[in-house]
Swiss-Prot record:
Similarity section: Belongs to the universal ribosomal protein uS19 family.
GO CC list: chloroplast; mitochondrial small ribosomal subunit
Main location: plastid
Any GO MF annotation of the entry: structural constituent of ribosome
Subcellular location, record wording: Plastid, Chloroplast
Keyword Ribonucleoprotein (UniProt): yes
The species this protein was found in: Vitis vinifera (Grape)
NCBIfam families for this protein: rpsS_bact
Protein name: Small ribosomal subunit protein uS19c
Pfam families noted in UniProt: Ribosomal_S19 (PF00203)
Alphabetically ordered keywords of this record: Chloroplast, Plastid, Ribonucleoprotein, Ribosomal protein, RNA-binding, rRNA-binding
Length: 92
């Protein structure tokens, strides 16, 4: 279900504060965050944000095509290793 248009997009306050500070000083550094639910807004374009995937922080460079999506969409949490090659033991 999508978010109501009456509400503003959710962005973590600490993340918004860090991006605003970097935009005023024109610095580019990696921002580390655990907030996968934050929505990408136009002020984030050009920054690299390291999003936590449950094990490590995965760096993501924000482009204009990502605006409106969530940060968690770009760092997958599951690692599919494939099905078993020889499944004879489970058939017994």
């Amino acid at each position: 279900m999508t978010r109501s248009l009456k509400k503003n997009p959710f962005i973590a306050k600490h993340l918004l504060r860090k991006i605003a500070m970097l935009n005023t000083t024109w610095e580019k550094e990696i921002i580390v965050t655990w907030s996968r639910t934050s929505t990408i807004i136009p002020t984030m374009i050009g920054h690299t944000i390291a999003v936590h995937n449950g094990k490590e922080h995965f760096p993501i460079y924000i482009t204009d095509r990502m605006v409106g999506h969530k940060l968690g969409e770009f760092s997958s949490t599951l690692n599919f290793r494939g099905h078993a090659k020889n499944d004879n033991r489970s058939r017994r």
